[in-house]
Amino acid sequence: FSDKFLMKNYISNGGLLGGHPDRNIKLGIDYCSGSLGNGLSVGCGVSLSYLKNKINKKVLVILGDGECNEGMIWESALFAGHHKLSNLFVFVDYNRQQGFGTTDEILGLDSLKQKFQSFKWNVYEVNGHNFKELINIKKKLKKNNKKPSVIIANTIKGKGVPFYENTFESHYKILSKSEFEKIKHL
């Protein structure tokens, strides 16, 4: 993912990395979930298939907190807990912002942790900017007790970039050359 061509053409016509990923097996993107909420449903299906066919693989689904406003997320979460999809791992970027407002303004999630716990998930909350916490969570995930697991990573959108930190402008925007030059040293 560090290839300069990929990043140079991010969210552009002909680029391989869009705002919502397109399926690209070479890049490790097995499914495109441009319609928010679909990714967890697909992840549940793949997870169930692996378990039924005794295939020892894990399924990772990455969600944004705004995506957790979608009803399909909660139907899938309930399904995963009920069917004990222990090979399913979800990572939620919980930055409390969406493309057009804060999560609380648009549709508050209240306690994301309690919601997943009530659906019979293992729930881990971490500081999404602390790499030690993120690495240590991997050890806990190995001790999975026959439930799906969710990591809720509390983050700040655009953290460390003064003109983007905690702003809506950073949601769909590509850095200009001058903006990139300003942050290279950070």
Give, region by region, the residue ranges found by the protein language model:
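Conserved thiamine diphosphate
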Residues: 54-57, 104-137
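A short alpha/beta connector and helix-capping loop motif
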Residues: 70-95, 150-152
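Cofactor-binding active-site loop characterized by glycine-rich and histidine/acidic residues
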Residues: 1-82
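Active-site beta-loop-alpha junctions enriched in small/polar residues
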Residues: 95-97, 129, 156
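Generic beta-sheet signal
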Residues: 57-61, 88, 147-155
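A glycine-rich helix N-cap at a beta->alpha junction
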Residues: 2-9, 80-93, 117-121
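Short acidic, glycine/serine/threonine-rich loops at helix termini
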Residues: 22, 72-74, 100-104, 161-166
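Glycine/aspartate-rich loop-and-adjacent alpha/beta segment that forms the canonical ThDP
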Residues: 131-186
